Amino acid sequence: VDFCVIDPDTGFEQRYRLLGPDQGIWHGHIEGFSLGTHYGFRAQGPWDPDAGLFFNENKLLVDPYGRGLAGAVDIRPEVYAHQVDEDLYPVSYPLEPSTTDSAPFNAHSVVIDTSFRITPQPKVPLDETVIYELHVKGFTQNMSEVPPNLRGTYAGLAHPASVRYLKELGVTSVELLPIHAKSDEPFLVERGLTNYWGYSTLSFFSPEPSYASAAARARGPQAVIDEFRGMVSILHEAGIEVILDVVYNHTCESGDTGPTLSLRGLDSPLYYRRTDTYPSQIIDTTGCGNTLNTDNPQVISLILDSLRYWVASMGIDGFRFDLAATIGRFSTGFTPLHPLLIAMGADPLLRETKLIAEPWDVGLGGW
């Protein structure tokens, strides 16, 4: 595995080979990188799509734990690990590895400062909670009191007019439709459409940059994160909790022949649930092309670490879990005693938050 540092202005890339794997971990200590550094990973390994293996060092991969994100994914042939035509369909079977570099067309992970003091959480009792579900981009679009340059942004949601409106309604908690950094699905791109709702996660740690104000986006990922944290603090000051609608059941990498942006290129069989008989085939209990493999302890850790980060560093007060039945599944089916669900309830940080489940998925017994 290579740790790749990228100059965002020139595209020049410096690669550092990591050591390992030691007990499954690739590691290294690299000094001299400042806040704002752009980076990603490249992973080498066997090319064997029939076994679910899509290692291709030509593909720059987003850090699954990256806190900041610069740019957006450009869905085009270069971001596929296998060769595809202009319509993004495989040019051959068996799949052949792509030889083009994806770095100019994938988002970049960015080093950011995580130290930020957020106003303490309101801790509204459950029996007094009034939740208002909203989309950050849509909520303020028609609010004349919010400046046009702030409408549809984190800063717009924190504007006094927005806060006053929520307080007048008696709202105690806002539930934000997905704000994790996202990418559009290929079938939408083919039709000239975008994923407005955001149930297509690219990064479980980074807020979606397009929901920040133009001024924040121009200053970079740190400013985007600071705007989000500032929004949370202002809402907390008004006594309003912030709950996130989160999508830990699948990612934006789609199905068996989707793009390779992050997890697929790092270890697809580990991160995505597959069949034992046909490991080339991803099991889909989400209706979105793939399913995160919560059989695996590393996937459980990824989800728990993400949840803790949003509470401890971003001030979040609770979560609504999209297709929650999926994250409580083993390969044999759903169980309320799944280790991930038990860990959420036992975690000293998470158990103090509001945890809301969408209690179904499209898998066997998911209704």
Q: Where are these predicted regions, by residue range?
A:
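N-terminal structural segment of carbohydrate-active enzymes
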Residues: 1-219, 233
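Generic enzyme active-site microenvironment
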Residues: 131, 243, 320, 356
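Substrate-binding/active-site clefts of carbohydrate-active enzymes
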Residues: 135-315, 323-349
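Polar, glycine-rich mid-to-C-terminal structural blocks
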Residues: 342-345, 352-367
